[in-house]
A protein has these predicted regions:
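Bacterial Sec-dependent N-terminal signal peptides
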Residues: 1-25
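Cross-family detector of peptidyl-prolyl cis-trans isomerase
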Residues: 19-363
Length: 363
């Protein structure tokens, strides 16, 4: 009797090992796609992208809930690869099979900088823009670095890349199985992993939306006072100009001043004041920004701010949204009502090369 009980307790684990066919030998969580062209096995990055893997695993196993949407049967079984582009990728996961379908909800991007579209076999989320993930995913035929930072990588092929390459449009995912190897992977709960990240992001999103409504209701004069007080909490020595620009001079510099028509060379790093997300940096490119002041125009707060230092100087600028990209922001990079923070090092200010009478007429 004891022997029978031992067998019953451990039989599911043994069956799991048989299903792996000796491919999934390392501890981890795997997705096994059985298609009409063969089998593809992907290792899932459940530790680096727990929300995204939680979504995928929950749908695949048919035991998942987001808001008022519940799933009680495997979601992907029987779906087609509705979009296949040669020498690029195969895409599936759409219940409609048209590229327009989703599971009835959308969730946030979960970009991990160590996970990139570095070669064939990268498993990544398809989307229609920032934070519009659902159930559609793709697997690459080759490196696609232009997708980095825009699509969430959450796994990679460990077996069956030849099958990926053989898949044609309308081929079928007959079955998608989730395989867990190791104690940690077996204990890992897809719903809990998803909820932990998703609900925190959702709560933060709701707070930000409430703050945006508050900001939208303020007059420009009221907002100047509000933003100045917010910045001074961390930078008590900050100053504010008549336009509402808040700045902290770190080094005044010693020589040439910024004037209209001068050639300016500077390094900058730009972040969002709310949340602190970096959106651009000349230092990341190892290439200073060079332009002719007030000839090649910048946002008003930037143009004003660099006049407060001289060549060799350093300054932090806190630019209110109305002197940056306004109420609408800049879709894809700058949110609505976004105040911008720039850390600037003014490298050089020189006379610009003389212009001829035809300059500026080619555009």
């Amino acid at each position: 009797m004891k022997k029978l009980l031992f067998t019953l307790l451990f039989f599911p684990f043994a069956g799991n090992l048989n299903a792996q066919n000796a491919v999934e030998s390392e501890n981890g969580i795997y997705a096994r796609f059985t298609t009409n062209k063969g089998i593809i096995v992907c290792q899932l990055e459940y530790q680096k992208t727990p929300m995204t893997v939680g979504n995928f695993v929950g749908l695949a196993e048919g035991d998942f809930k987001v808001g008022d949407k519940s799933f009680s049967k495997p979601f992907f079984d029987g779906l087609i690869f509705h979009r296949v582009i040669a020498d690029f990728m195969i895409q599936g996961g759409d219940p409609q099979g048209t590229g327009m379908g989703d599971p009835g909800y959308k969730f946030y991007d979960e970009i991990d900088p160590t996970l990139k579209h570095i070669g064939p076999g990268i498993l990544s989320m398809a989307n229609s823009g920032p934070n519009t993930n659902g159930s559609q995913f793709f697997i690459t035929h080759k490196a696609t670095p232009w997708l980095d930072g825009k699509h969430t990588v959450f796994g990679h092929v460990i077996s069956g890349q030849d099958v990926v390459n053989a898949i044609a449009q309308n081929d079928t995912m007959r079955k998608v199985e989730i395989i867990r190897v190791g104690r940690e992977a077996i204990k890992w709960n897809a719903q809990a992993a998803f909820d932990q990240v998703y609900l925190a992001k959702k709560a933060q999103d709701e707070l930000e939306q409430a703050e945006l409504l508050k900001i939208a209701a303020m007059s420009q004069d009221d907002y100047k006072v509000f933003m100045y007080n917010e910045v001074k909490k961390n930078y008590p020595n900050a100053q504010q100009s008549a336009t509402g620009l808040v700045y902290v001079i770190l080094d005044n510099g010693k020589s040439n001043e910024v004037k209209e028509g001068k050639k300016v060379s500077l390094h900058y790093t730009g972040t969002l004041r709310r949340g602190g997300k970096k959106f651009d940096s000349s230092k990341d490119r190892n290439a200073p920004l060079e332009f002719e002041y007030k000839v090649q125009r910048m946002i008003p707060g930037f143009e004003e701010g660099i006049t407060y230092i001289k060549e060799g100087g350093k300054i932090m600028l806190f630019i209110p949204y109305y002197n940056a990209y306004g109420k609408q922001g800049r879709p894809g990079s700058i949110p609505a009502y976004a105040d911008l923070v720039f850390e600037i090092e003014l490298l050089q200010v020189t006379d610009a090369a003389p212009h001829n009478e035809h300059d500026g007429h080619q555009h």
